[in-house]
Amino acid sequence: MGGVCSCVFKDDDKKKKLRSNDDDKSRGFSGKLKSMRRSKTSDSYYSDNYGGSRRKSSKPDEVVFNFSGELGPMPPLRNDSTKFMQRNSFMGRAGVMGLEKAVEVLDTLGSSMTRMNPSNAYLSGVTSSRGGKVTILAFEVANTIAKGAALLQSLSEENLKFMKKDMLHSEEVKKLVSTDTTELQILAASDKREELDLFSGEVIRFGNMCKDLQWHNLDRYFMKLDTENSQHKLLKDDAEARMQELVTLARITSELYHELQALDRFEQDYRRKLAEVESLNLPRRGEGIVILQNELKQQKKLVKSLQKKSLWSQNLAEIIEKLVDVVSYIRQTIVEVFGNNGLRDNEGEQGRERLGEAGLSLHYANLIQQIDNIASRPSSLPSNVRDTLYNALPATVKTALRPRLQTLDQEEELSVPEIKAEMEKSLQWLVPFAENTTKAHQGFGWVGEWANSRIEFGKGKGKGENNGNPTRLQTLHHADKPIVDSYVLELVVWLHRLMKSSKKRAHGVKLQETNHVSPPNNRTISNTQLSLSPDFTYKNQLSLEDRLLLDRVQSIRFGPNLSKSQELVGLKKNKKGFKIWALSRSTGNSPKVDLSDKNSSSDLDVLDGLDFAFQ
């Protein structure tokens, strides 16, 4: 009977399914999406012969069990109206997403347009909550702020006066770079524009990283400032006030940089201590662990407080707004001071080989500093210093050095102080250029550079001081290569004469005041014969204090001590009554040699070269 009932139920189910499919097709649906109209409860449930209700299968994979009503599935908590609301909410979310996409496209197109009103300092005060915090970019932003502060400080009135009156008219700059003042002004303007391009490039990069789309593509806005002379002029006080705020935040960020390094060291010590305790199976409540935990907690609190005060917690859009104002002010200041100079290469610069363009400025700076170090102490030098210096010389200097050294014998001999005085005439102004070049190459923009040097802005800096960063005209960057080669050649020749004179003075040879070439009738005495002569002594070369010290050392009588390796117990007497030392264990393996018959004085004469019997 149960089998018959089940068959009847199956036939009824098939008929109802076919009827529902026909209704869906008549409405225009393929069966994948059902009708959104509210259906009756009889469509979803049907009554069986036992007075119970059964649920229709809504999925093709769902199996309909033909059990009694007692074990039938529970009626659903949601009806078709809730399903309809879900479908509507899904369509609503899709519409919102499409609308947001359209808004983003319009924002991108709007940001690419350069219709920005500069009358309000580049949309001043218009910030978005989508900008986000600076967080880990704080250190890179602080490095950029340090560069901007240095550039803005170099454009102050005092530094500009120093550059125009002193630097451009300096004799040293004219010797190395050019004697044309106009060309020097063009080089100075191009340097400032290049520094500005580097600074603004980083601001553009940060703007593209901002979530607020109005700060994207800032390069087009800066190009508009160059091509179109904007009537709006940002006041100097406003730009300096914004820069002062940024410098204050950057200074706190530098403290955060150092404290984060200290926190990393504390964490490493704590982990190392924990590993040590675990390896020894000791409890974690020791005194050392507790101390490290307290230090680690205090350091974390300090780091969190600095993060709140520094660039870490600032809004990136607000920082970019201030940086854009600073870039705009620097651009208009460069135009006011230098005009159109430095915008394109000058025709007078063609044909000049500059050290900076060739990438040789740092190499020549090291050469000059090495020559200065050798000249300061020529008598105490390692053996490989001269070879290292010679190998580092340029090819043009090496080629011209050999004929110059061959003509030294015909020149007048000078003393060591005289040679040093001649070298000092060139080194006293070349060495500062070399030191500035080395300093400029050491600061190549790494993230922690600003943290190791204190950032100062607008605090009465002296003339020519640019946060410790020299300008390129104060380095070897624009120096003419043939001119520098000639100075290096002269210094190397003087250095050769200095080394030669220092060696002669060290061997006790007194230089003649006139020509050092002796007449042919006089016999030249070599240094070796002078040193081996019995009448020769070094005491006439020593001062009174050195002689007294030498006599005191020679008067000390040294007594022989007992060696533990030889096991010398004491003195023994032979048959004749002479005291002898006990022999060591190693002396028994050596053959005995009788030296009583030989004359020791003749051997010493042969060694000293005073015995002429074999000549």
Curated annotation (Swiss-Prot):
Composition-biased stretches (Low complexity): 42-52
Xref: Pfam families: DUF3475 (PF11961), DUF668 (PF05003)
InterPro entries xrefs: DUF3475 (IPR021864), DUF668 (IPR007700), PSI1/2/3 (IPR045021)
Region (Disordered): 16-59, 506-529
Protein known as: Protein PSK SIMULATOR 2
Keyword Nucleus: yes
UniProt record, GO biological process: positive regulation of growth; response to peptide hormone
Phenotype reported upon loss of the gene: Reduced fertility, premature senescence and severe dwarfism in psi2-1 psi3-1 plants due to reduced cell growth and proliferation as well as premature leaf growth arrest.
Organism superkingdom: Eukaryota
Source organism (scientific name): Arabidopsis thaliana (Mouse-ear cress)
